[in-house]
Every structure is written in structure tokens, then in C-alpha cells.
């Protein structure tokens, strides 16, 4: 309940870059023989690689507001947890991020495609991925300021662990 109206709101996470560089390299190829542009043209219903925050309107419908409140792009997110982390009466939002490898990086995929399609056939694509470093990202936490405003306070609250996190648990210990 992000707005304290007594109605349950919910969020679904996905992979949207939190900065311009990450956003662009994760888009995939838009042209060429190995293009991933089909993904944009043919899905039904369309799928968007970003978080979705659904606000309960108290009717039969929810309103999707992740872009409106600044929570749509939190990198390669696995877990979303709502909780009043600073005891101010508002539900804050915590995201865990990271991946074993950067599988959505279009630049890497294109480079690997060139290498694996070459005449030399030195390495398989799986070998190339194995040699890549894990895709380490910082976890993020956003303070709920009320009135549908959120502020990234990850480093202030020291919850910006840099690595690969695929889950989390939240509990009130006292």
C-alpha cells in the first residue's frame, strides 16, 4: 500500500537500465540478420522490459504508475520488497539486482555472434559467456516521500550492496 489508502498495490520487476548506457546496451539489435526487432513488432500483448507498479484504484482496475513515480528502471531486478524501512509510516521499496552474466548486453551478443560464426570456430558461444565476469549491480532502495514521490537512498541507508543478489527477505525483528 504505497499511498496508505488501505488498498493493496503490487509491483512486478523486470530489466530496465538505470542509466543511459545500460538502457541502450540492453535494447538488443534493431536491424540486421540477427535482429531482435521482431520482439518489438510481434508480441501480443506487448511486453516492456521495465518494472510495473500497479496502484489499486478501488475499482475493478489498477493503474500502472512505475514511470510516474520513478520506479520503472532499476537494472536487472530480481526481488522487490515493500516495507517501512525508516518507520515514517510509508512503504519504502527495496530492489535486489545482478546476474551471473550480462545476457541482455547487445554489444556482447553481437561480438559473440561474430566470433562463433567465424571460420575459425575456436570457441562456442557458451565458452565465451563463461569467460565473462558476473554482471554485478548495486541493490537499490527508494524512500517513499508520500504523494507518489520516491527518492533513491541506497547509499545513504547503506543498502547498495554491489554484486549479484537474486533474493531478499524482510522482517521486523523488534
Indicate where each model-derived feature is located:
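Acidic, glycine/proline-rich Ca2+-coordinating loop motifs
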Residues: 1-174
Amino acid at each position: 500500500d504505497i499511498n496508505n489508502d488501505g488498498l493493496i498495490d503490487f509491483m512486478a520487476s523486470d530489466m530496465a537500465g538505470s542509466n543511459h548506457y545500460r538502457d541502450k546496451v540492453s535494447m538488443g539489435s534493431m536491424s540486421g540478420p540477427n535482429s531482435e526487432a521482431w520482439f518489438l513488432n510481434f508480441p501480443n500483448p506487448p511486453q516492456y522490459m521495465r518494472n510495473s507498479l500497479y496502484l489499486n484504484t478501488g475499482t475493478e482496475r489498477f493503474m500502472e504508475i512505475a514511470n510516474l513515480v520513478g520506479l520503472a528502471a532499476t537494472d536487472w531486478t530480481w526481488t522487490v520488497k515493500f516495507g517501512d524501512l525508516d518507520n515514517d509510516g510509508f512503504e519504502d521499496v527495496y530492489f535486489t539486482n545482478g546476474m551471473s552474466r550480462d545476457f541482455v548486453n547487445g554489444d556482447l551478443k553481437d561480438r559473440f555472434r561474430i566470433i562463433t560464426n567465424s571460420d575459425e570456430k575456436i570457441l562456442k558461444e557458451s565458452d565465451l559467456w563463461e569467460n565473462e565476469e558476473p554482471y554485478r549491480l548495486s541493490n537499490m532502495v527508494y524512500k517513499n516521500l508520500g504523494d507518489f514521490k520516491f527518492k533513491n537512498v541506497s547509499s545513504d541507508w547503506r543498502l547498495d550492496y554491489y554484486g549479484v543478489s537474486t533474493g531478499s527477505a524482510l522482517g521486523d525483528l523488534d
